[in-house]
């Protein structure tokens, strides 16, 4: 299964250039960026032109958000955490990884920075917004514990139907996963994965289908997901347990839901920017963070 891209803040090198050029102007004579027959482009020329780009304010906002988050919570996100997430994507996409980066407008370094921004945002959310007992009880009503399944992802429905027929004929699920699954991250281990109800990388249709299965059962019809069709077999579906013993998992589930809520995350980022005293000095770019100053819709 391909992970859903949920990169909240995209960082662009143009924003870096914008601030660097701004600093150069205040510290030294106007330098040449380029020359041509009959003229030249100076740093001030380029800076002025750059500010007219429709995306410049967005890129500046993203850069400031990242720096504010990193200053406030950088010690809470290790390089290993970012590298592990990066390697997970790299393994998942295999030889298509560079194409994945290109399609989403990333270099390898900017993708790592975006992953770090995601982790920093999650830390900020947990620091600035707490989960109440009533919210935990609401989640408990539909909570599911960590389950382990095997799955086979196919690109078309007919292949998934054939897999189900092969299983009915007595063929081994793990063997079929190795030959028929297109999920390079799990096919070699028989398609085995474990997940909790707060998992953000799996389609809801996948999780819903899995939760309906008893140990040893598999889906009798293909399950449609974002990037194909799934056949799922339940390996371990434990009992729900008690509310008290599940509080940690319930809290994680609430935070996972909040992290996907743009209005909640807007308020969190707004508070981070306020706490870090972020101010834009250039009057032409002064409104770059205005969307974080407006009240977000309450959920």
UniProtKB/Swiss-Prot annotation:
A lipid is attached at residue 24 (S-diacylglycerol cysteine). Residues 144-236 form the PpiC domain. Residues 1-23 form the signal peptide. GO terms for molecular function: peptidyl-prolyl cis-trans isomerase activity. Its EC number is 5.2.1.8. Disulfide bonds: none annotated. GO terms for cellular component: plasma membrane. Pfam families: Rotamase. It is an enzyme of class 5 (isomerase). It catalyses: [protein]-peptidylproline (omega=180) = [protein]-peptidylproline (omega=0). It is found in: Cell membrane. InterPro entries: Foldase_PrsA, PPIase_dom_sf, PPIase_PpiC, PPIase_PpiC_CS, PrsA_foldase, Trigger_fact/SurA_dom_sf. GO terms for biological process: protein folding. A lipid is attached at residue 24 (N-palmitoyl cysteine). It is a lipid-anchor. Keywords: Cell membrane, Isomerase, Lipoprotein, Membrane, Palmitate, Rotamase, Signal. This protein is essential for production of active forms of the serine proteinase located in or secreted from the cell envelope. Belongs to the PrsA family. HAMAP family: Foldase_PrsA (MF_01145). This is Foldase protein PrsA. It comes from Lacticaseibacillus paracasei (Lactobacillus paracasei).
């Amino acid at each position: 299964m391909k992970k859903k891209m949920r990169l909240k803040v995209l960082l662009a090198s143009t924003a870096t250039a914008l601030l660097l050029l701004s600093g150069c102007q205040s510290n030294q004579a106007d330098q040449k960026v380029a020359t041509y027959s009959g003229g030249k482009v100076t740093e001030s020329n380029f800076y002025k032109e750059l500010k007219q780009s429709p995306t410049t304010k967005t890129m500046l906002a993203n850069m400031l958000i990242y720096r504010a988050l990193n200053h406030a919570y950088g010690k809470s996100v290790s390089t290993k955490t970012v590298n592990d997430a990066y390697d997970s994507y790299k393994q998942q996409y295999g030889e298509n990884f560079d194409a994945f980066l290109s399609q989403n407008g990333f270099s390898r370094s900017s993708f790592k920075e975006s992953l770090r921004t995601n982790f920093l945002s999650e830390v900020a959310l947990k620091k600035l917004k707490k989960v109440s007992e009533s919210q935990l009880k609401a989640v408990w009503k539909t909570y599911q514990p960590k389950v382990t399944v095997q799955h086979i992802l196919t690109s078309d429905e007919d292949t998934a139907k054939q897999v189900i027929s092969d299983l009915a004929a007595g063929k081994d699920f793990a063997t079929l996963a190795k030959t028929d699954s297109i999920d390079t991250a799990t096919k070699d281990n028989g398609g085995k994965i474990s997940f909790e109800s707060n998992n953000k990388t799996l389609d809801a249709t996948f999780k819903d289908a899995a939760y309906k299965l008893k140990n040893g059962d598999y889906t009798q019809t293909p399950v449609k997901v974002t990037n194909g069709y799934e056949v799922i077999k339940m390996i371990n579906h434990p009992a729900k347990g008690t509310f008290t013993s599940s509080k940690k998992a319930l809290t994680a589930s609430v935070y996972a839901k909040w992290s996907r809520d743009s209005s909640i995350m807007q308020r969190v980022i707004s508070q981070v920017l306020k706490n870090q005293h972020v101010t834009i000095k250039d009057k032409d770019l002064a409104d770059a963070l205005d969307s974080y100053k407006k009240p977000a819709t309450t959920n």
